[in-house]
């Protein structure tokens, strides 16, 4: 996986100081960012030129204390063929020697008005999401009440139709059929559509529909955190389904576990409403309100009261 410098330039809203169109095609292969402090002093052991080189106030102030010759020599050594881009934070002035070294070594120079630490965070967050390894999952990803719900189930059970009904009820489609999921960190999953399927839903008997064209921009979303999975399966009278909500079921994707709810599909059952309820119930649990525990406590108290009466 890699990200082109031109994509970083657009997404993080940076200013291009030096770099041709060809140089903007350079690829960034790591989300790690280098703050070249010791390198300014001439110590290049363990230098990582393949990383983005971010220069903030500390690095810049030290650089400006050098003589013009030393400044030029240090920058020439810092700018390597594998260096994708050098970024200057805080709208700091670009010294002539840096422009000269960039021209000699053909290195892209970008600048931002943002503070160094905040800029570093923005770049890392963007690159982490773009460079993370993707896992393709069959299903429908919806944004329901601000929560990412992954709808799965056997082929033909009605996942896309349920997604369409949820869109009509005011929720947003993220992806249909193929959901590309990646771990943004050790605890968080994010999902997005395959580019060719963006905003599209396949409905049997109707064909492919463009949700954005039919229902507007408010009906779609480019990406979403995946917080809960819903698995649709055919109703089986011989199978026991969870009725209290205390059965623990999880789905693991890319090393991250999320809760999963299994919903039996039966003629006449409004699945979209059930999924809405599952999403709201998940949010309530996250806020510390668990209806199952409340019911169990009430039941325990009732049993205790009955035992006292019989005694």
UniProtKB/Swiss-Prot annotation:
Residues annotated to bind ATP: 153-160
Active site: 138, 159, 177 (proton acceptor), 243
Catalytic activity field: [HPr protein]-L-serine + ATP = [HPr protein]-O-phospho-L-serine + ADP + H(+); [HPr protein]-O-phospho-L-serine + phosphate + H(+) = [HPr protein]-L-serine + diphosphate
EC number: 2.7.11.-, 2.7.4.-
Additional note from the record: Both phosphorylation and phosphorolysis are carried out by the same active site and suggest a common mechanism for both reactions.
Family per similarity comment: Belongs to the HPrK/P family.
Annotated protein name in UniProt: HPr kinase/phosphorylase
Organism: Streptococcus gordonii (strain Challis / ATCC 35105 / BCRC 15272 / CH1 / DL1 / V288)
Lineage: Bacteria, Bacillati, Bacillota, Bacilli, Lactobacillales
Gene name as annotated: hprK
């Amino acid at each position: 996986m890699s990200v082109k410098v031109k994509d970083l330039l657009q997404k993080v809203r940076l200013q291009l100081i030096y770099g041709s169109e060809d140089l903007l095609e350079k690829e960034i292969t790591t989300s790690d960012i280098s703050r070249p402090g010791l390198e300014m002093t001439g110590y290049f052991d363990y230098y990582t030129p393949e990383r983005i080189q971010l220069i903030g106030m500390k690095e810049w102030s030290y650089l400006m204390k050098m003589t013009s010759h030393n400044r030029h020599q240090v920058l020439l050594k810092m700018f390597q063929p594998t260096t994708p881009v050098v970024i200057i934070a805080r709208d700091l002035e670009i010294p002539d020697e840096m422009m000269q070294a960039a021209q000699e070594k053909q290195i892209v120079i970008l600048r931002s008005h943002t503070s160094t630490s905040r800029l570093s965070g923005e770049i890392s967050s963007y690159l982490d999401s773009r460079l993370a390894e993707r896992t393709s999952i069959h299903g429908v990803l919806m944004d329901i009440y601000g929560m990412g719900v992954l709808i799965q189930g056997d082929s033909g059970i009605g996942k896309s139709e349920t997604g369409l009904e949820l869109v009509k009820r005011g929720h947003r489609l993220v992806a249909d059929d193929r959901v590309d999921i990646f771990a943004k960190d050790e605890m968080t999953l994010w999902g997005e559509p395959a580019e060719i399927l963006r905003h599209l839903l396949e409905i049997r008997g109707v064909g492919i529909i463009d949700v954005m064209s039919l229902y507007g921009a408010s009906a779609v979303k480019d990406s979403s955190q995946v917080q809960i999975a819903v698995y649709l399966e055919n109703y089986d009278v011989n199978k026991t389904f969870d009725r209290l909500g205390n059965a623990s079921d999880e789905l693991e994707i890319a090393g991250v576990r999320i809760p999963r709810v299994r919903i039996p599909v039966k003629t006449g059952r409004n699945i979209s409403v059930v999924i809405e309820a599952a999403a709201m119930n998940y949010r309530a649990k996250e806020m510390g309100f668990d209806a199952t525990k409340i019911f169990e406590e009430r039941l325990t108290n009732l049993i205790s009261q009955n035992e006292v009466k019989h005694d």
